[in-house]
């Protein structure tokens, strides 16, 4: 588990489990978590790591409704949690099935997942939301369906960093599941906007050239 400082006050936290990458953006008044981890225990570890960097009040954005990105939320206590409505609905109504599937697939996870309360996001990202963290405005954007119907990306314009969730994966091909819309996904990757550093939901941070190559790979799969 390691912190990567991508720019002033912008961090990615890399985890060996599932090659997961979480994010943290600091302002002068509050901080933003980008996803919260795979389960309550993982979330608690993430919360402790964040508190080693900052005591600022936190809010979270969930990039999409898959369990490995949001089941850590309960560890942070009451806090504002942003997501697209489709992701919030998936979290509310689909997490039990996801947990059952992964507990059967990887039984070592079953107990930890069973002890992880589901926290449904309470703030909506329909198109664009600007969050003022104090001295820095972060943009939450829904650019259309892709990896899931409710993907949200997080742009930190002053730092040239974009958190892409599972719209981008490094170290493995993009995960095209039954809830993916590949044709729309290709278009979404073309609309990410300028960013020097793109942080995938799994894997190490990449550049725009990597994103373009992955976009071409997806286009070939349509």
Report each predicted region and the residues it spans.
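Metallo-beta-lactamase
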Residues: 5, 31-32, 36-40, 89-215
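Active-site metal-binding motif and surrounding structural segment of the metallo-beta-lactamase
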Residues: 28, 40-86, 194-196
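Short amphipathic alpha-helical segments
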Residues: 45-47, 73-75, 94-95, 176, ...
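A short catalytic or substrate-binding loop motif that flags glycine-/basic-rich loops and adjacent residues
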Residues: 15-17, 124, 144-149
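Divalent metal-coordination and catalytic microenvironments
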Residues: 9, 25, 35, 50, ...
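Conserved beta-strand hairpin/beta-sheet module of binuclear metal-dependent hydrolase folds
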Residues: 3-49, 152-166
